[in-house]
């Protein structure tokens, strides 16, 4: 009996020693592998910082120009540019190859073929609802039209900033704005927005909640309206629901990868006077209106200076000018 117990103890002791030896051997092997891989990674990282001839050399058709030899990415060689323009532009140009021509001209400014995308929009309303600002840099050309100054100005405020928006059910609820960054954005073919401020007893202040005719009108037959009311006061709203929608939005901050070029007009529209607009580099500019070819030539000529005032996109590819959250 004692012999069996001694044998059992001896078996477990030998097993423990054997397992310890195996684990120690495996540990040494793992240490060797880890140290070796670390050494290889360090050596490769050092070599990768060396000059890499030809990687960032733009092909312009001529090798006479001296280019700085660098391993850093060029400013535009890995970037995309979206150019948005009204539908009247290609109609006036009347040239099926005008985009190819502009692509070749952008190439002379350092933008490779295939990095510039041309996007047409029919009107301010359609563009404001779904702008599709997908590129690293987005430049919007807006033709100045008398009588549409307000729509253009509010479109600029919309797409030059990022917004977080919720749908509003004005038939069931009262709404209030909680700060300067909180606005109500209405869109449609014809938006008329009326409001009735309420006191703590939900009685109208200067208006009757049961009589829409007594409401104050804050937007009249507009395609796009960014409505601002007194903060921290409940309001009952009325809109032309058949031709308009309204959302409760909060301005998150500037969208620095978007710029607007106003085409024509005596003065450039200025949105920096808005108290919700933080001090920032001006990304609205104006070019003289002559012909659309002249406008595009001007854009190509100054494209790099324009982009210098912008910041490259940092959000997802599928980013619009406002986020719609249910």
From Swiss-Prot:
It comes from the Viruses. Disulfide bonds join 82-135, 165-249, 191-244, 196-207. The keyword Calcium applies. N-glycosylated. Residues 253-255 are annotated as: GPR motif. The keyword Glycoprotein applies. It is found in: Virion; Host endoplasmic reticulum lumen. Residues 1-50 form the signal peptide. Keywords: Calcium, Capsid protein, Disulfide bond, Glycoprotein, Host endoplasmic reticulum, Host-virus interaction, Metal-binding, Outer capsid protein, Signal, T=13 icosahedral capsid protein, Virion. GO terms for molecular function: metal ion binding. Gene3D superfamilies: Glycoprotein VP7, domain 1, Rotavirus outer-layer protein VP7, domain 2. Glycans are attached at residue 69. Ca(2+) 2 binds at residues 177, 228-229, 231, 301. Ca(2+) 1 binds at residues 95, 206, 214, 216. Its main location: virion. InterPro entries: VP7, VP7_1, VP7_2. Residues 165-167 are annotated as: CNP motif. GO terms for cellular component: host cell endoplasmic reticulum lumen; T=13 icosahedral viral capsid; viral outer capsid. Homotrimer; disulfide-linked. 2 Ca(2+) ions bound at each subunit interface in the trimer hold the trimer together. Interacts with the intermediate capsid protein VP6. Interacts with the outer capsid protein VP5*. Calcium-binding protein that interacts with rotavirus cell receptors once the initial attachment by VP4 has been achieved. Rotavirus attachment and entry into the host cell probably involves multiple sequential contacts between the outer capsid proteins VP4 and VP7, and the cell receptors. Following entry into the host cell, low intracellular or intravesicular Ca(2+) concentration probably causes the calcium-stabilized VP7 trimers to dissociate from the virion. This step is probably necessary for the membrane-disrupting entry step and the release of VP4, which is locked onto the virion by VP7. Some rotavirus strains are neuraminidase-sensitive and require sialic acid to attach to the cell surface. Some rotavirus strains are integrin-dependent. Some rotavirus strains depend on ganglioside for their entry into the host cell. Hsp70 also seems to be involved in the entry of some strains. In group A rotaviruses, VP7 defines the G serotype. Belongs to the rotavirus VP7 family. This is Outer capsid glycoprotein VP7.
